Every structure is written in C-alpha cells, then in structure tokens.
Amino acid sequence: MASTRTALVTGTTHGIGRATAFALGRAGWQVGCCARNADDVDLLLAQLADAGIRAAGRPADVSEEREVRTVAHHVVEALGPVDALINNAGVLIAKPFEQLTLADWDRTMATNLRSLYLMTREVLPEMRRRRRGTIVNVASLAGRNGFVGGTAYTASKHAVLGFSKSLMLEVRKDDVRVIAICPGSVDTGLIRDQPLLKADSTRILRPEDVAATIVHVLELPDHALVSELDIRPTNP
C-alpha cells in the first residue's frame, strides 16, 4: 500500500479506534486521529510518532458540525486527501428501557449516528471528485439483533447498517466503496463499563481483531468491495 494514502479514524484514542490507527500505520498508511479528550489525542499522536507512523489530529466532538469540519480540514492540510474514512466513534449505554433517559438516547444517537453522517458528508465529495475512496462504518452484530438493555444502542446500529447499504448503492458508480463492519462482543470499555452486560474477556474479540479486519478490507483491490462483514468470537 502506498505510504501516501491517508486514513481518518474517529474515536481513535481507545479500543478499536486506537488499534486501527496502529494497524493502519504498520501497513503504511498515514493516520488522521480525533477524539474528545485533548490529552488523550496528544498522547496517541506521540505514541504513533514513536512507532514511526505519520499522523495528525486534534480533539473533536464528531457529533458537532463545526468540529467535524475543523478536524477534517486539519487532517487534509497535514496529510493530504482522505483515502479512507473509518467511522468508529461510538457509545454503548445498556439500561432497561424504562431507565433509559432522553439524554442517554440523544447521546447514543449523536455519537453513533449523527457523527457518522457529519463526517461522511465532510469527506465524501472529494472522494467522489477523485473517484477514489473507502468509507468503513463500524456497525455491530447488534445492528442485526437485539439484546436486553440495548434499545438505544441496537436502534443506532440498525440505522448504521441501513445508512451503509443505501450509501453504498449510491456512490459505487463513482468508484467509492462503503463497507459496514459488524463486530460481535469486543473487549473494550464499551462492554467493561456496562454492569448489565456480561462477557468473558478471555473469549471475546480483541480490538486488534477488528482492526486487522478493517485493514484487510481496505487493502483489497479497488475494484473489489466487501459491502458488509461480520466478525464474531469463535466460542464466546
């Protein structure tokens, strides 16, 4: 893969996003980074630099239009046009429905869905103009199923899959690929911080497993499109 290709990854400082940043860098990509916490972003950029990976980024709330525009422009100015966008930022609030507040619902939709819309809207026009680019949306197997306490999360991930399917059909004629990655349970803070969810961390997926999958689909020939891909623990 040419070293001049640039990937912009949202939610980059922890979990799948962090693992993806390093996996892409090791594969020769330049990496654009963003997350809410400025100190976490600075630390990640320093660690990527120490690993010999060219990266740029800034703190951003990717559910806010102005901040999305600012971080996207910053990455383009520092690294060049975005060849791959990985919409990874996400939140999981697992509660029985009657305990789910409107604030919980709005935060889930803003982080998991609104951010995806805003970031895609920001980078897609240039991809279409260049007739080159890939958008990877990190969905979930919860986008096909449900689970107790998951009304907000599963609603958002069903929406991510619907968004991805429709956009894929819309932009493939412009040689832009849209891919939805659907992980099962992954050992990240999203699960560890939810007492309602129980998972054996020794048996579920690791962030690096999902990151390797993302790199794999990105490095397929440009004429090949894996529109959806499920990855799940072998024996959870």
Which functions belong to the PLM regions below?
Residues T13-H14:
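Conserved glycine-rich cofactor-binding loop
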Residues W29-L44:
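Conserved glycine-rich Rossmann-like NAD(P)H-binding loop of the short-chain dehydrogenase/reductase
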Residues A38, P59-V71, L102:
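The beta1-alpha1 cofactor-binding region of Rossmann-like NAD(H)/NADP(H)-dependent oxidoreductases
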Residues P96-F97, D104-D106:
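Substrate-binding pocket helix/loop in short-chain dehydrogenase/reductase
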Residues T120, S156:
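Active-site helix of classical SDR
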Residues S140:
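Residue(s) in the substrate-gating loop at a strand-loop-helix junction
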Residues K173, A180-I181, L196-P236:
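C-terminal helical subdomain
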